[in-house]
């Protein structure tokens, strides 16, 4: 105990001597300066971190929601719908914006359309300056005018084809009327002959020719009657000629 107490007293006696010396003061001041500057640096860094924590970490997740790139799921469909509605409104406004042409403008446009249906850019620009319109309006007018011209041409061709078909069908029905032939009269002498006559085959053939004209039927009947008369005369002459033994 006595030795330890004596050692402590010696250290206390030596401490003032170290502090009073110039080297000891310089070392202590250097340590003090270094530690203060280091603490200031740490305090400044800590203040910056604390400020960032107060700004960003006060409400967790708020910065993510408030960032422009990230939005909540409930807001996204509503924004898309608003954007679509605005685009539809713009389209409707563009469609409703139509140009009304006066009589002088229409006359000038029609006069150029009679010359050419497809004017080039130089012609359109010159015409637009003359009628006090934009080149885009003139181009749209020519597009609509060409479409109207094509519709009128198709309507005219359809009406012409319908009239031609109607006239052709009338001519065909007038030509293709059926003609009913008259039945040929039967001769009276044909009924007087029997079936055993040698010319009965010719008589049966005459009955099949019912579709012939009346004049042809009469000529055929006369020729058959003449043949029958000749046959009778021949048979009578044969019976009268005596036979030679």
Curated annotation (Swiss-Prot):
Write out the biased-composition intervals (Polar residues): 69-84
Which InterPro entries does the record match to this protein? Answer: HD, Homeobox_CS, Homeodomain-like_sf, OAR_dom, PRRX1/2
For the motif OAR, what are the positions? 222-235
Q: Name one GO cellular component term.
A: nucleoplasm
State the gene name recorded for this protein: PRRX1
DNA-binding positions are 94-153
Protein name per UniProt: Paired mesoderm homeobox protein 1
- UniProt organism field: Gallus gallus
On assembly, the entry states:
Interacts with MAF and MAFB.
């Amino acid at each position: 105990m006595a030795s330890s107490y004596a050692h402590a007293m010696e250290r206390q006696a030596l401490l003032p001597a170290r502090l009073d010396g110039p080297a000891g003061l310089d070392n202590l001041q250097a340590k003090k300066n270094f530690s203060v500057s280091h603490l200031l640096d740490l305090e400044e860094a800590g203040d910056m971190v604390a400020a960032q924590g107060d700004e960003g970490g006060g409400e967790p997740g708020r910065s993510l929601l408030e960032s422009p790139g990230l939005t909540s799921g409930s807001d996204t469909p509503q924004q898309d719908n608003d954007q679509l509605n605005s685009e539809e409104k713009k389209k409707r406004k563009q469609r409703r914006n139509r140009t009304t042409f006066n009589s002088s403008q229409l006359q000038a446009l029609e006069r150029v359309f009679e010359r050419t249906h497809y004017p080039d850019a130089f012609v359109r620009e010159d015409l637009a300056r003359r009628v006090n319109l934009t080149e885009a309006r003139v181009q749209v007018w020519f597009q609509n005018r060409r479409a109207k011209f094509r519709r009128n041409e198709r309507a005219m061709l359809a009406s012409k084809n319908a009239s031609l078909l109607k006239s052709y069908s009338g001519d065909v029905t007038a030509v293709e009327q059926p003609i009913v032939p008259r039945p040929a009269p039967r001769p009276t002498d044909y009924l007087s002959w029997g079936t055993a006559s040698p010319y009965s085959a010719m008589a049966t053939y005459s009955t099949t020719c019912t579709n012939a004209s009346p004049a042809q039927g009469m000529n055929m009947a006369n020729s058959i009657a003449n043949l029958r008369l000749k046959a009778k005369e021949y048979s009578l002459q044969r019976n009268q000629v005596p036979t030679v033994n």
